[in-house]
Each structure stands twice: as structure tokens, then as C-alpha cells.
């Protein structure tokens, strides 16, 4: 059996915008032709697209880095560089994307064909044709392309199913799934047979249909990661109805009621909302000796934990192997699904707000100043660093423009207020220059 991978850590990087060009029009009979350098092309975005044909995150085990192409540089004759194509990354249905640095959820991808731009490409730098003014009709100024967005991500896959089969290993979940659907799970008489969630479609005699997932076997301590643990619990989050399968034959020497309590405790510990999902108790292996006695004992113990005003869960005695009692179970499941709404997986506070990439945030400081151990001044801040990376330092006019932008942002004044003196070293990233007062 191929390994099932339901979490992955990857890095995505959008394409850098193409650099703008400095060029001048030089044609016969056109004296003083003026600037003619075009803009760079837009960098490619990284786009996640949901593909219903994918079932695991296995591909991300071998390919963890995804980089979109950069935009083309601007050209002469005022021609713009070509924008790069987006990089399409296909993911399975049910993939949750988190920011690995903040832990916040970015998006939940559940519909086939759904698209989400996970990293935005940088805009192209402007060519010198953009900087012409009456005072400076032939500027030697251009911009570098803007860097593409770069992100560290955690992908998490939760299978999409209406109904989840839960229960201890070897209670007969895989057998039940194979009987009620066309799924062909691998079945064996040993624990942890099911490592991969198996999905199957059920169609009842009345024409109702729904998806069922036989999820990896659960043991006590799963919510703390014991055994297959949180892998199992992650997948049950998307189900609307839970079929709690119990081995009423007690063939492995366990008490069915104790199994029932233990599994519910794990569900509650992992996520309190899991217990809001309606459960149907499936009393399996009723064709085995003493199963009837165990079922009666189970019902008595169950009743003691409910008061007279509470409704007991439905119990359906079945035998997966002997194909007994299945029709009633499936009809009841379809009826319960009909009146059970979908559950919100996450609270709104779990999601990270995705700001417009070029949006203005008035609360965000334009720059920050700190002092290094060697007494140099360090300038930082998203806006300032973006201006820096887009400045073409090969052109004197571009450097002078950058200096004017710093003054306009109040950097010179702020440095003086912090005590900077003529000749002090100021750093932005790896670039350093002298402060001139």
C-alpha cells in the first residue's frame, strides 16, 4: 500500500517583476528623440487549483519548492516586457493551507476547480519613458522589478465525506465499507489495517446517495498523537454524521461500552465540535456467539448516562460479513444526513486576513530605525525595503531619486532625531551608505 501523506510543508515564491529599461530614441531626422525605455513585465503568481483526481499530498514529499517565472525586462522603443505565466500547483479537495510562520489558516480548498492565488507576482519596474518631465525630458531613471511574494506554507488534507466510520481497530469498519459501497479497502485481522482513509459512495434503495469514509483505526491517546492519532481525527472533521462501529462479539476481550466511551473521549479532546455531530451506533458482528448478551449489557450501561429527557443515540445491530441489518442502517443514515447541516470547521478568528498586495495600510509604519553593535544605523520596513529593491543603483539619477524618496518619508529627519551624525554608516539590507547632514 502506498503511504498516505496528509500534511506537507512547502515554500512558494512568486516571480519577480521585470526591470524597466533606460533607452533613448536615436533615429535619423529625429533629433533629441527622448526616452524610449519600456516597463518590465509582471512576475508570475503561484496559484493553487483544486483537482478532484488527487487523493493525497504525496507529490509534495518530493517537490517542496515552487517558484513562478520572472517577468521579462523592458525593451527599447517603449515596448513592455512580457508578463510571466502563473505557476499552477494542483492540490486535492479538502486541503487546508496555513501560513507556517503565523500558524493562521490562509484558505480552505474544498471545491473541484477552486483557485486561490497563494503568492502574488511582483509588478514590473518602470522604464525611463515613465519619468520624463518638462524639467527632465531625458531621464536616466528606471526601476527594478518588484520582488515576488514568498511564503512558507503548511498543507493539511482532510478527506471529504458525508459520513465517517469510527471505532477501534478491527471492529469491522473496512468490511462494512466494502459491503455497502464499491470501495475495495485492504482488510486483515490485525490492528491498524487501515492507514489510508478509504472512500466509497453509498446508494440506498430509496435512491439517496452519500459518501462514506472508513478512517484510520483509533486508539486511546489519539488526540495526543498516539498511534495514527491526529491523522485520523483530522479527517473526521469534515464529516456530518458519525457511524460509531462497535464489536459486539467482544472477540478481542474488550468491553464494547468502554470502547464507545474511549473513542468519544478522544473526539471531544481533539475538537469539542466533533461531539456536536450526530452519531449512530453500529453494533457489528451480531452473528457471533454472545453478541446479543453484550448488546443488552451495552444498552443498559448507555441508558445510565442519559437522563429521561435526553434522546438516546440510535443503535443498529448488523453483521457486515453476513450482510445483515444493513438496509435499515443506510436508510436511517440518509435520513439523518438530510436534516444535519454542514459544520463550520474553523472559527473566523482562525483565518489570516489576506491584505491586498499593493494595498495601503495607514497603521503600518513606513520604516523603523535600530542601532547595530558596530554603531551603524539599520533602516527596515516593508515600504522602504520595497523602494530599495526597485531602485536601479547603476544609474546616478535613480540613486538621487531614491535619496529624495527617503527624505520625503522623513528618514533623514528621524536619523537626526536619533543622534545620527555626518559620516555615520546607514544600512538597508546588505547595502550601506554614509549619512550626510
UniProtKB/Swiss-Prot annotation:
Its EC number is 3.6.5.-. Mg(2+) binds at residues 174, 194. Residues 359-437 form the OCT domain. It is found in: Cytoplasm. Residues 2-160 form the Obg domain. Keywords: Cytoplasm, GTP-binding, Hydrolase, Magnesium, Metal-binding, Nucleotide-binding. Residues 161-338 form the OBG-type G domain. It holds the Pfam family GTP1_OBG. One of its GO terms (biological process) is ribosome biogenesis. GTP binds at residues 167-174, 192-196, 214-217, 284-287, 319-321. One of its GO terms (cellular component) is cytoplasm. Its cofactor is Mg(2+). Its main location: cytoplasm. One of its GO terms (molecular function) is magnesium ion binding. HAMAP family: GTPase_Obg (MF_01454). PANTHER family: DEVELOPMENTALLY REGULATED GTP-BINDING PROTEIN-RELATED, MITOCHONDRIAL RIBOSOME-ASSOCIATED GTPASE 2. NCBIfam families: Obg_CgtA (TIGR02729), Obg_CgtA_exten (TIGR03595), PRK12296.1 (NF008954), PRK12297.1 (NF008955), PRK12299.1 (NF008956), small_GTP (TIGR00231). An essential GTPase which binds GTP, GDP and possibly (p)ppGpp with moderate affinity, with high nucleotide exchange rates and a fairly low GTP hydrolysis rate. Plays a role in control of the cell cycle, stress response, ribosome biogenesis and in those bacteria that undergo differentiation, in morphogenesis control. Belongs to the TRAFAC class OBG-HflX-like GTPase superfamily. OBG GTPase family. Monomer. This is GTPase Obg. It comes from Streptococcus suis (strain 98HAH33).
Amino acid at each position: 500500500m502506498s503511504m498516505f501523506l496528509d500534511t506537507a510543508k512547502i515554500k512558494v515564491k512568486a516571480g519577480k517583476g521585470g526591470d524597466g529599461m533606460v533607452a533613448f530614441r536615436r533615429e535619423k531626422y529625429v533629433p533629441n528623440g527622448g526616452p524610449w525605455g519600456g516597463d518590465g513585465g509582471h512576475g508570475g503568481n503561484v496559484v493553487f487549483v483544486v483537482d478532484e483526481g488527487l487523493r493525497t499530498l504525496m507529490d509534495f514529499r518530493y517537490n517542496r519548492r515552487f517558484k513562478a517565472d520572472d517577468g521579462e525586462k523592458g525593451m527599447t522603443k517603449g515596448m513592455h516586457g512580457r508578463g510571466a505565466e502563473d505557476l499552477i500547483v494542483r492540490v486535492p479537495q479538502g486541503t487546508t493551507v496555513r501560513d507556517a510562520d503565523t500558524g493562521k489558516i490562509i484558505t480552505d480548498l474544498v471545491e473541484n476547480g477552486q483557485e486561490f492565488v497563494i503568492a502574488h507576482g511582483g509588478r514590473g519596474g518602470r522604464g525611463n519613458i515613465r519619468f520624463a518631465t518638462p524639467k527632465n525630458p531625458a531621464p536616466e531613471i528606471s526601476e527594478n522589478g518588484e520582488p515576488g511574494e514568498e511564503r512558507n506554507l503548511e498543507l493539511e488534507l482532510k478527506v471529504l465525506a458525508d459520513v465517517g466510520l469510527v471505532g477501534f481497530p478491527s471492529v469491522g469498519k473496512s468490511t462494512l465499507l466494502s459491503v455497502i459501497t464499491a470501495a475495495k479497502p485492504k482488510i486483515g485481522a490485525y490492528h491498524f489495517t487501515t492507514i489510508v482513509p478509504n472512500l466509497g459512495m453509498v446508494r440506498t434503495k430509496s435512491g439517496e446517495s452519500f459518501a462514506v469514509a472508513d478512517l484510520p483505526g483509533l486508539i486511546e491517546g489519539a488526540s495526543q498523537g498516539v498511534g495514527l492519532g491526529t491523522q485520523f481525527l483530522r479527517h473526521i472533521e469534515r464529516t456530518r454524521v458519525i457511524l460509531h462501529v462497535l464489536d459486539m462479539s467482544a472477540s478481542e476481550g474488550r468491553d464494547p461500552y468502554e470502547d464507545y466511551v474511549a473513542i468519544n473521549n478522544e473526539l471531544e479532546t481533539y475538537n469539542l465540535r466533533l461531539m456536536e455531530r450526530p452519531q449512530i451506533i453500529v453494533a457489528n458482528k451480531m452473528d457471533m456467539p454472545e453478541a446479543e448478551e453484550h448488546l443488552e449489557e451495552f444498552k443498559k450501561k448507555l441508558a445510565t448516562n442519559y437522563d429521561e429527557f435526553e434522546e438516546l443515540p440510535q443503535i443498529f445491530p448488523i453483521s457486515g460479513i453476513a450482510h445483515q441489518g444493513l438496509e435499515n442502517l443506510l436508510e436511517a443514515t440518509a435520513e439523518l444526513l438530510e436534516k444535519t447541516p454542514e459544520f463550520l470547521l474553523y472559527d473566523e478568528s482562525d483565518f489570516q486576513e489576506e491584505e491586498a498586495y499593493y494595498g495601503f495600510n495607514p497603521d503600518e509604519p513606513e520604516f523603523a530605525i535600530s542601532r547595530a553593535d558596530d554603531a551603524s544605523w539599520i533602516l527596515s520596513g516593508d515600504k522602504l525595503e520595497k523602494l530599495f529593491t526597485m531602485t536601479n543603483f547603476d544609474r546616478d539619477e535613480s540613486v538621487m531619486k531614491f535619496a529624495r524618496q527617503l527624505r520625503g518619508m522623513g528618514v533623514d529627519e528621524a536619523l537626526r532625531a536619533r543622534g545620527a551624525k555626518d559620516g555615520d554608516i546607514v544600512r538597508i539590507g546588505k547595502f550601506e551608505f554614509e549619512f550626510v547632514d
